[in-house]
């Protein structure tokens, strides 16, 4: 492989066992990065690593375990070198409705989607600040822009991540560290294959990764896609409540 600006630089991708995370890890490795790929299932990681031999190293991890995240960050740097790009992507989704409201599921969503990303920032952020370089990418969602039926817990965590990124961006850039936030719409993955409701502007994983890679290369703060869904969600969020709820009521599944 010819040397490129990314050759042998280290990227850490969580949630790399499937979906967007898996595709991102593979694309980064093909671009020359040394990729530390994390997920809960070792078998998924080993299969991924075999696709780009010598460029992807597996680091099995449960992102809800703060101590394990700290140890994994240290192990990656000891094994591969300084982490220059960190994409925190692990996530879970439990449909939340009036009929099935569950505190336990809400907590699980917060622990994985929000605190999982913060736990992984723990070993990365101080090192990047000390080295005065690096790029941290948080995986949020367009559902973080406005509350939608069934997405109370999921959307809340994504809204929180958008806020975290907005707060950190001007602060971390003082130390040469770039902060980005990814806001995908509906992407065809094993997770969305389970959805029983309409998914407007659905795109495939390769197209999603194209958007993400372009945004990361440009060091954009916000990487939102597809544009049709992003525009629709921003418009919905801007509406007065009476109009907003008139629309979101129609999104409630199996409404009687």
What positions do the PLM features span?
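Residue(s) in the substrate-gating loop at a strand-loop-helix junction
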Residues: 141
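C-terminal helical subdomain
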Residues: 181, 197-232
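Conserved glycine-rich cofactor-binding loop
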Residues: 15-18
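Substrate-binding pocket helix/loop in short-chain dehydrogenase/reductase
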Residues: 97-98, 102-110
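Active-site helix of classical SDR
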Residues: 121, 157
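Conserved glycine-rich Rossmann-like NAD(P)H-binding loop of the short-chain dehydrogenase/reductase
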Residues: 31-47
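The beta1-alpha1 cofactor-binding region of Rossmann-like NAD(H)/NADP(H)-dependent oxidoreductases
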Residues: 61-71, 103
